[in-house]
């Protein structure tokens, strides 16, 4: 008998199944597309970032990054001693016009409180960092260093986590 049944095997369901299985729980995931050919997560961009408005999401983003960096150790098996999710760390640049700048300035306070490593760039200085971007109408922008944010290959990640759960 299963200890836990999870409905939906996307990134949240798969992550939940993984962490519960690491605690010794028997987990079954019910996924309408158990082949993952049309499931949303493998078809997504696989981004991970810290730049959110709420502290909870910032902290979750930090946790996800640490997990992703540990994939080679956490998900290795006899059959796959060097697993990878083809991680690319490239950072994220988010830009805001005057109508959303105040909202972002408030979010930056949360970024600082959570040690997210976010840098604020005035719109007038954006071209000093990114000369190929048209900064017209940009009030402010935020960026993290290249090691904090990026993306993984969702298909590779899905295949790495499938052995930790029974998908039906």
Stretches found by the model and what they are:
Residues 158-164:
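Conserved small/polar residues in nucleotide/adenosyl-binding loops
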Residues 45-129:
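Dinucleotide-binding Rossmann-like beta1-alpha1 core, especially the glycine-rich loop
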Residues 39-45, 133:
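Short, flexible, mixed-charge acidic loops at enzyme active sites
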């Amino acid at each position: 008998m299963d200890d836990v049944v999870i409905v939906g095997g996307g990134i949240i369901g798969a992550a939940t199944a993984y962490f519960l299985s690491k605690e010794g729980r028997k987990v079954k995931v019910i996924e309408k597309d158990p082949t993952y050919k049309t499931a949303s997560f493998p078809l997504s961009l696989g981004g991970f970032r810290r730049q959110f408005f709420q502290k909870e999401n910032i902290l979750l983003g930090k946790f996800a990054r640490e997990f992703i960096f540990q994939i080679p150790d956490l998900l290795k098996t006899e059959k796959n001693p060097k697993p990878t999710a083809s991680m690319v760390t490239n950072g994220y640049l988010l830009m805001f016009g005057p109508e959303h700048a105040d909202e972002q300035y408030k979010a930056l306070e949360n970024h600082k409180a959570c040690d997210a490593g976010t840098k604020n760039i005035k719109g007038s200085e954006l071209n000093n960092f990114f000369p190929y971007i048209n900064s017209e109408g940009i009030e402010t922008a935020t960026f993290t260093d290249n090691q904090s944010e990026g993306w993984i290959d969702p298909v590779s990640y899905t295949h790495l986590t499938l052995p930790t759960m029974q998908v039906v």
